[in-house]
């Protein structure tokens, strides 16, 4: 049997431009977090009930890697390595829809990562813009994206699946 943790390490040896992990459930979260912290564009999925709970979970999973990994290391690393958390929900028709998008500011206060609401569903089910935004607009610019334009262009109050 080949563990996901080993596959993540082997993938990093290939010097990829991006690393995408289908589902993070255990100690492989540490290796993914280290890759993200080194500047490698990465994405993963995990199961949680909200964007905030996903942040808590991604802070907890690396602790499964061993006794020498502490939350004093993991929490600030998550805060600096992850920009956005997109929470999907399953609607009545079985479609996945964006429920909320949260931005991580990079700041930690009393062991809690500061997040802000970028998008959320209102009481009518419309996806609406929150007050938050991801930090590091210059990185989006270097990649050819105008962050302000991307965030302001969402005006369709979409109820659709993504």
Where are these regions (language model features)?
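Nucleotide-state-sensitive switch-loop elements of NTP-binding domains
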Residues: 1-10
């Amino acid at each position: 049997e080949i563990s996901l943790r080993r596959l993540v390490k082997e993938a990093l040896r290939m010097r990829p431009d991006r690393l995408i992990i289908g589902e993070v459930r255990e100690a492989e979260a540490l290796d993914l977090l280290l890759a993200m912290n080194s500047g490698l564009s990465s994405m993963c999925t995990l199961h949680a009930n909200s964007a905030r709970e996903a942040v808590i979970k991604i802070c907890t999973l690396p602790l499964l890697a061993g006794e020498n990994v502490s939350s004093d290391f993991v929490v600030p690393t998550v805060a600096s390595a992850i920009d956005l958390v997109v929470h999907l929900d399953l609607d009545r028709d079985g479609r996945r829809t964006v429920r909320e998008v949260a931005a991580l500011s990079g700041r930690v206060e009393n062991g809690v990562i500061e997040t802000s609401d970028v998008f959320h569903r209102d009481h009518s089910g419309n996806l609406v813009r929150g007050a938050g935004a991801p930090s590091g607009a210059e990185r989006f610019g270097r990649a050819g994206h105008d962050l302000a334009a991307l965030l302001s262009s969402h005006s369709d109050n979409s109820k659709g699946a993504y």
